[in-house]
Amino acid sequence: MSEPKYKRILLKLSGEALAQGEQGFGVDPTRVHEIAAEIAEVHRLGVDIGVVVGGGNFFRGVAEQAKDMDRVSADHMGMLATVMNSLAVQDALEKQNVQCRVMSAIEIFQVAEPFIRRRAMRHLEKGRVVIFAAGTGNPYFSTDTAASLRAAEIKADVIMKATKVDGIYDADPHKVADATMFAQITYMDVLKKGLRVMDATAISLCQENRLPIVVFNLNERGNIQRVVMGEAVGSLVSA
């Protein structure tokens, strides 16, 4: 079997990926176990894996539901949502016999380790999957930005952003039938065109640190491994 193209990855999952259906709420155990099985397959290839999970299946600080709330309080609720999701993914991975640690950007000692970069690096070197919870630990920063930050900190080779579409399009493919998908695009073009890949802060952080981003469809079974092996899956964002 050929060698993986990427030796260390940061996988970004949306909270909605763990839920059932389009507008799913909460965690669907079957879906979480399907995702964990795919991560476990990649882990068995000897790839170092960091994971960042969003919290949108429980609460989103910038969403309509939070419009009358203080933004900082809303973002803190979103961070706690990511902790719940991280624990769900950890449990599913452990059932796949994958050693796993949740590291939280906010102190929550009873359920997760605090994020300490050197300790995270040690876990990865020991072959453990590390799930980074609670975003950056600061309000006003998205979990996409947290993914970019953690990827830079652990010296990941790539950020793999799992979505419900095949890649990056010039328009919403669910609304525009003839939307065109980009096989490859630069950071600057993503920013100039206002493409909703990640927020501008996350994209800029990747650009500064020369971190490629692969946007791919998580609903296509086996895509995580295909991306890791370097197959032409999804859209690549690079310099």
Curated annotation (Swiss-Prot):
It is found in: Cytoplasm. Coiled coil: none annotated. Residues 21-26 are annotated as: Involved in allosteric activation by GTP. Gene3D superfamilies: Acetylglutamate kinase-like. The keyword ATP-binding applies. GO terms for biological process: 'de novo' CTP biosynthetic process; UDP biosynthetic process. Keywords: Allosteric enzyme, ATP-binding, Cytoplasm, Kinase, Nucleotide-binding, Pyrimidine biosynthesis, Transferase. The keyword ATP-binding applies. Its EC number is 2.7.4.22. It comes from the Bacteria. Pfam families: AA_kinase. Its main location: cytoplasm. One of its GO terms (cellular component) is cytoplasm. It catalyses: UMP + ATP = UDP + ADP. PANTHER family: URIDYLATE KINASE (PTHR42833), URIDYLATE KINASE PUMPKIN, CHLOROPLASTIC (PTHR42833:SF4). NCBIfam families: pyrH_bact. Belongs to the UMP kinase family. Catalyzes the reversible phosphorylation of UMP to UDP. This is Uridylate kinase. It comes from Koribacter versatilis (strain Ellin345). The gene is pyrH.
